[in-house]
Amino acid sequence: GCCGPYPNAACHPCGCKVGRPPYCDRPSGG
């Protein structure tokens, strides 16, 4: 999923959720 104020530029292999970066709420590899 993409997180941060700029989802298009800040993508993470995790589900987005309010919290500390990378705002992972469900590990999805990498």
Swiss-Prot record:
Keyword list, A-Z: Acetylcholine receptor inhibiting toxin, Amidation, Disulfide bond, Hydroxylation, Ion channel impairing toxin, Neurotoxin, Postsynaptic neurotoxin, Secreted, Toxin
Instruction: Read off the Pfam families from this record.
Output: Toxin_14
- Expression sites (tissue/organ): Expressed by the venom duct.
Q: Where in the cell is it found?
A: Secreted
Does Disulfide bond count among this protein's keywords? Answer: yes
Record PTM 4-hydroxyproline, positions in chain? 7, 13, 21-22, 27
What this chain does, per the entry, is described as: Alpha-conotoxins act on postsynaptic membranes, they bind to the nicotinic acetylcholine receptors (nAChR) and thus inhibit them. This toxin binds with high affinity to both fetal (alpha-1-beta-1-epsilon-delta (CHRNA1-CHRNB1-CHRND-CHRNE) subunits) and adult (alpha-1/beta-1/gamma/delta subunits) mammalian muscle nicotinic acetylcholine receptors (nAChR).
Family stated for the protein in its record:
Belongs to the conotoxin A superfamily.
UniProt protein name: Alpha-conotoxin EIVA
